[in-house]
Regions:
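Phosphopantetheine-dependent thiolation modules in NRPS/PKS and related acyl-activating systems
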Residues: 2-36, 45, 50-81
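Two-component histidine kinase catalytic core, primarily the HATPase_c
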Residues: 40
Length: 81
């Protein structure tokens, strides 16, 4: 499989959190910088799954610290590998 484009992740996060795409970088913290909560995180993952036609294993979600956008990006690309 291929890697997810970062711009795709930016778009999904921007839509879920109602922020501008240019505010979102790999180092952006989901909670502190974007104000995301656990429900927002679920919506982001669901949006990614729908967009890419993948399923992120629950055990992967539970075992990773998804503090930054880069953490989410890495999780998705590992899932797609």
């Amino acid at each position: 499989m291929t890697c997810m484009e970062f711009e795709t992740l930016q778009k999904i996060i921007a839509e879920v959190l109602d922020v501008e795409e240019d505010e979102i970088t790999m180092d952006t913290r989901l909670l502190e910088d974007l104000g995301a909560d656990s429900l927002d995180a679920v919506e982001i993952i669901m949006g990614i799954e729908d967009e890419l036609g993948i399923t992120v294993p629950q055990e992967e979600l539970e075992s990773r610290n998804l503090a930054t956008v880069g953490d989410v990006y890495e999780l998705i690309n590992d899932t797609m590998a």
